Amino acid sequence: MDSISKYDNKCAIHKEHKIKMICATCKDVVCNECILLDHNGHKFGRIDVENSKEIFEEFKNNHLQNLDKQIGINNELLNESNNLFKSLEDKHTENVNTITEVFKELPKLLPIIEIDKIKQLVTLYDENKDINTNISTIVHDYSNNINLITNKYKNTINQINIDQIINDNNSYQHIEILKHCCQSRLLIKDNQNENKINELMDQYKNVNFVNNSEQVKESIKEIFEISNSLSITNVKDPKRVIAGGKECFIYKNDSIIPNGTTHLAIAPSVKTIKIGSIPTSVKYLVLLDGFNVQLKEGMLPQSITHLFVGAIKKPLLKGSIPNGVTDLSLLDGFNQKITEIPQSTVHLYLFDTPLTNFPFQNFILRTSKYKQQFAHPKVKDWNLSTWEPKIEL
């Protein structure tokens, strides 16, 4: 191996181009493509003893020992990703099995629809699988880069005489060392790797699976509805909620609701609700998207008259809706089973929900967002745009 090919002098980003200069703004080695694309407008300098020594000392004293820590962080993120993907995979299997069982009872025409619905599920599953694969690849690549650098220098770093290498005009070894110095900084700089993995994890999609088999006589092609949304782990607490014409106090996990509060929104970060924790002054209550507590009788006070329910993650069981509620609004994305609506409820408001079967005999008011067809003796179309809660994330 000749002295030219012995050392890696290629750009870590633009791998076909050789490192030419140092960006004085970023203190990074750059190739011609870097100068044109990624460092446009920056100041550049020739590679010399002074700037080389500065970069090397930073690598030697700060970056090298932190590279192993980065592998641990990456592996933790990978484990979190794998666990999340496993739950999505299990749900995928459950959904496919449900579709298969229902379609076994239907005539020969229905397997065509079955294939289409499963294809939708598989497409979403493949997207989640691709995300998981991408995260695994990123962690693997970063780990390889880290191992390459640590294995090369961890036992020799104190024996490297950068001054001698530079003075001996061994430019290829010199530039390789500079490259690894700068590359190590990028591997741990500003948590870029963690941010990239978290951004990919935010793209995981839950499958919103609604079984409408009881309505097969009305619309056989709508037995199952398949859509997707970001995983529940990605649902964020809002900054501001307005409902019933007034700003709500946002109840977050472990927060205390002030006495006298009349308008309340419960954030998705809330893990438990103790009976008596919500004051009886509350009249308007919003259950926000991602709310994941199984409501039981007594958790919500009887003082609530107006209940707004978003895309929550648990069904509304018997007794979970307070008997004082007069107006119940099912907001965009609500797709949970409702076991019972209390007799106190006078109006049921429907926004963009896929449900068509409600245990309710009083007036149903549906917005233009509601696209489902269903028979009910007291249903009316209504403009409820001013009634819909305003949520600022």
From Swiss-Prot:
Zn(2+) binds at C11, H14, C34, H39. This is Uncharacterized protein DDB_G0279899. Signal peptide: none annotated. Pfam families: FNIP, zf-B_box. Transmembrane segments: none annotated. It comes from Dictyostelium discoideum (Social amoeba). A zinc finger (B box-type) spans 6-47. CDD domains: Bbox2. The keyword Protein biosynthesis does not apply. Keywords: Metal-binding, Zinc, Zinc-finger. One of its GO terms (molecular function) is zinc ion binding.
